[in-house]
Swiss-Prot record:
Belongs to the class V-like SAM-binding methyltransferase superfamily. Histone-lysine methyltransferase family. Suvar4-20 subfamily. This is Histone-lysine N-methyltransferase KMT5B. The keyword Zinc applies. The lineage of its organism: Eukaryota, Metazoa, Chordata, Craniata, Vertebrata. S-adenosyl-L-methionine binds at residues 98, 203-206, 210, 257, 272-273, 320. There is a cross-link at residue 555 (Glycyl lysine isopeptide (Lys-Gly) (interchain with G-Cter in SUMO2)). Residues 35-51, 590-606, 624-641 have a biased composition (Basic and acidic residues). Its main location: nucleus. One of its GO terms (biological process) is positive regulation of double-strand break repair via nonhomologous end joining. Residues 193-308 form the SET domain. It comes from Homo sapiens (Human). It is found in: Nucleus; Chromosome.
């Protein structure tokens, strides 16, 4: 398997099936060439006769179509190539490479042959002028690789006694042609050649083969100019006299353009065939050619060309190339009747064979036979990445990685929820590069062992506090499974022992904060007791992913705060903290705020968690009615946000009183002013809020969100309505209860049975009044079969009858109208559609997220427009988003 043999329309003679188009085809072609071209042939023959006289050649060479521009006939090319390879390549490789051995057939006038070269047909002569000088010749080649002196190397190669006898019968022109041919082979070893010749024993058709391997990176359309092919055209008589089928016809190609056979020799004759070649031959002159790269070639990659469709049998059925081995075709095809079935994802569609995929296959060590149909994208398991992040977080308090703020994928990154035992910022860190990979091809994330232990511990705590209830507006829900919206009155049967018992269970990094906050990232988050810290993510944290370190040794005194020298922060999903947007007034008296300001302290952990100073924000006057006197702390002068946390999953027994606190988290508006932290058990806010002073006043658009998961039509329904206070539509059902910058819903129980999990994360873009920006709505729902009675009871008290306790949740949503987003925005429907579509790829950031259960479509209603979203497929190419006006 060395070079071009017989093909249906390319070559004359083949190594294996040369019977079809051998002699008859040659005769027919020669007849076509001679008929109707007598005048041209006469002129050409005259030129040939003149050149033959000059060169001292006669015999059948005079019958050649014409002498090439180099003056080297086909027979001379064969002789020179055999001698050049014997001098240059054979000593270097350590074995004898392919030879034409045409000297066994002397011409009628054999004046230029030595006597030892004239043997019978049955005893072909091989060039062995360098017998006993292999080591010496190899040293010449090694020396040339260092100094690259062509003339010096040629003299050393032709310094033997054999050379005097060989050149005795050669004229000056023939000596020059031979010298140039040796130079062509010597240039293979130049440092700037970009390739090298190596032994190759892969193919069964040859014992001692060779291959050409790239030594540098070649780009597409680059010409490998030193990989030269020398061409000589063959007449019918020359073919019969010089070529022996299956022995030396490895480099004969038929030119359909010239309608003649061509002999190709030189360094390019060692290029092997591949059914997926990376190079092709291009002409560089009348009798020379070089190689052009069809695609990028890496160093160490073999350079290959395509020999033809029928070179290795019918349809190359005996081909032994790497591509046939990988595909299971050619000589590697299953010979047992039917072809071996290959695993196919979709019979109509398959991934193309690209170099990146094939190289990734080699690196990953995947099964090579599946590369034609299966994705070889590197899907890193969540646990692997998370464990690495945990190890990193034990050494560093925060690690910032600069991200491209204008990248649509990065701005839409959904920060994963931090489990209680982990401080990693993201369990899917590699998902940034794999956002286009379908979820069906991704490995499901497995929860860590420490996380399972925490869940079991939390479950035991919940059983002890099963009697605790939470009132959210008119909804009465049992167990901390429903998101609390900011400023909701919280009533519990038992008061916790103070804000000092606030502990962080896990961190939640919502997507809206990725684009809403451009402040400094949080360097430290502190918690009390053995619980893990809550990770707070600001707008800038999208580009600087923060790894937070455990601060289990930190103890908080009562009435003290965790100080954060950062901007407006993101609270945690499983903690009872409540953060209020900065443009909205906080629920504190200014005097009380000032009094408590002195008690605000920033704690540093033993491992050196650093706090980052933010710019000095303006003092925010905050007025609110406090129904019960509770310790609420804020330091608006220095700290942009001072959250005090109430963790429902505290690991200490004394903190078990906070288990009943429902899961809640809201987002803060991107104002560099302070956010108060509500740690009270029962807290009622004013219905009317005054806008606080900030750098830039922004008009706030408020929405009511209604989510119906299961109804008669079977399509989950999400309805958004503008509030009356945004000078738009009215919906007075929930004027008195809730006020938040956006809606974040997460319903979760325990994760012991993953089959019962229901997850829905939605990113919806809205255009606020000026149409200059968009924001996101994030909804996370997890189905749980337990405690359906309490959920249903709360929903019935709200006056709504639902078959499923998760079927209806109403809340309010605020959209801050400002133009700091890096992302383009369109009208409501198109923006919502884009966000929903992209959410199909971002919704598996959480460790315990699983693909959506049977629900096939989700209907999003914004005003008079609605969108039906197909949530059963993870493919971006699925054109399943339909806009219904």
């Amino acid at each position: 398997m060395k070079w071009l043999g017989e093909s249906k329309n390319m070559v004359v003679n083949g190594r294996r099936n040369g019977g079809k188009l051998s002699n008859d085809h040659q005769q027919n072609q020669s007849k076509l060439q001679h008929t109707g071209k007598d005048t041209l042939k006469a002129g050409k023959n005259a030129v040939e006769r003149r050149s033959n006289r000059c060169n001292g050649n006669s015999g059948f060479e005079g019958q050649s179509r014409y002498v090439p521009s180099s003056g080297m006939s086909a027979k001379e090319l064969c002789e020179n190539d055999d001698l050049a390879t014997s001098l240059v390549l054979d000593p270097y490789l350590g074995f004898q490479t392919h030879k034409m051995n045409t000297s066994a057939f002397p011409s009628r006038s054999s004046r230029h042959f030595s006597k030892s070269d004239s043997f019978s047909h049955n005893n072909p002569v091989r060039f062995r002028p360098i017998k006993g000088r292999q080591e010496e010749l190899k040293e010449v080649i090694e020396r040339f690789k260092k100094d690259e002196h062509l003339e010096k190397a040629f003299k050393c190669l032709t310094s033997g006694e054999w050379a005097r006898h060989y050149f005795l019968n050669k004229n000056k022109m023939q000596e020059k042609l031979f010298k140039e041919h040796v130079f062509i082979y010597l240039r293979m070893f130049a440092t700037d050649s970009g390739f090298e010749i190596l032994p190759c024993n892969r193919y069964s058709s040859e014992q001692n083969g060779a291959k050409i391997v790239a030594t540098k990176e070649w780009k597409r359309n680059d010409k490998i100019e030193l990989l030269v092919g020398c061409i000589a055209e063959l007449s019918e008589i020359e073919e019969n006299m010089l070529l022996r089928h299956g022995e030396n016809d490895f480099s004969v190609m038929y030119s359909t353009r010239k309608n003649c056979a061509q002999l190709w020799l030189g360094p390019a004759a060692f290029i092997n065939h591949d059914c997926r070649p990376n190079c092709k031959f291009v002409s560089t002159g009348r009798d020379t050619a070089c190689v052009k790269a069809l695609r990028d070639i890496e160093p160490g990659e073999e350079i290959s060309c395509y020999y033809g469709d029928g070179f290795f049998g019918e349809n190359n059925e005996f081909c032994e190339c790497y591509t046939c081995e990988r595909r299971g075709t050619g000589a590697f095809k299953s010979r047992v009747g039917l072809p071996a079935p290959a695993p196919v994802i979709n019979s109509k569609y398959g991934l193309r064979e690209t170099d990146k995929r094939l190289n990734r296959l080699k690196k990953l060590g995947d099964s090579s036979k599946n590369s034609d149909s299966q994705s070889v994208s590197s899907n890193t398991d969540a646990d692997t990445t998370q464990e690495k992040n945990n190890a990193t977080s034990n050494r560093k308090s925060s690690v910032g990685v600069k991200k491209n703020s204008k990248s649509r994928t990065l701005t839409r990154q959904s920060m994963s929820r931090i489990p209680a035992s982990s401080n990693s910022t993201s369990s899917k860190l590699t998902h940034i590069n794999n956002s286009r990979v379908p979820k069906k091809l991704k490995k499901p994330a497995k929860p860590l062992l420490s996380k399972i232990k925490l869940r079991n511990h939390c479950k035991r705590l919940e059983q002890k506090n099963a009697s605790r209830k939470l009132e959210m507006g008119n909804l009465v829900l049992k167990e901390p499974k429903v998101v609390l919206y900011k400023n909701l009155p919280i009533k519990k049967d038992k008061e916790p022992e103070g804000p000092a018992q606030a502990a962080v269970a896990s961190g939640c990094l919502t997507r809206h904060a990725a684009r809403e906050h451009r402040q400094n990232p949080v360097r430290g988050a502190h918690s009390q007791g053995e619980s893990s810290p809550c990770t707070y993510i600001t707008r800038r944290s999208v580009r600087t992913r923060t790894n937070l370190k455990e601060a289990s040794d930190i103890k908080l005194e009562p009435n003290t705060l965790n100080g954060y020298k950062s901007s407006v922060t993101e609270p945690c999903p499983d903690s009872g903290e409540q953060l209020q947007p900065a443009p909205v007034l906080q629920e504190e008296e200014l005097a009380h705020e000032t009094a408590q300001k002195g008690e605000a302290k920033c704690h540093k952990s033993d491992t050196g968690m650093s706090k980052k100073k933010s710019r000095q924000g303006k003092l925010v006057k905050q007025f609110a009615k406090i129904e019960e006197s509770t310790p609420v702390h804020d330091s608006p002068g220095k700290d942009d946000a001072v959250p005090d946390l109430m963790g429902p999953h505290s690991d200490q027994g004394e903190h078990s009183g906070t288990v009943g606190v429902p899961v809640s988290y809201t987002d803060c508006a991107p104002s560099p002013v302070g956010c108060s932290v509500v740690t009270s058990d029962s807290f009622k806010t004013k219905d009317s809020f005054r806008t606080a002073k900030s750098k830039k006043k922004r008009r706030i658009t408020r929405y009511d969100a209604q989510l119906i998961l299961e109804n008669n039509s079977g399509i989950p329904k999400l309805t958004l309505r503008r509030r009356h206070d945004s000078s738009s539509k009215t919906n007075d059902q929930e004027n008195d209860g809730m006020n938040s910058s956006k809606i974040s819903i997460k319903l979760s129980k325990d994760h012991d049975n993953d089959n019962n999990l229901y997850v829905a994360k939605l990113n919806n873009g809205f255009n606020s009044g000026s149409g200059s920006s968009s924001t996101k709505l994030k909804i996370q729902l997890k189905r749980d079969e337990e405690n359906r009675g309490s959920y249903t009871e709360g929903l019935h008290e709200n006056g709504v009858c639902c078959s499923d306790p998760l079927s209806l949740l109403e809340s309010r949503m605020e959209v801050d109208d400002y133009s700091q987003y890096e992302e383009e925005s369109t009208d409501d429907s198109s923006s919502s559609e884009g966000d929903e579509e992209e959410d199909d790829y971002d919704d598996d950031f959480e460790d315990d997220f699983i693909p959506l259960p049977p629900a096939k479509r989700l209907r999003l209603i914004v005003g008079k427009d609605s969108i039906d979203i197909d949530i059963s497929s993870r493919r971006r190419e699925d054109q399943s988003l339909r806009l219904n006006a």
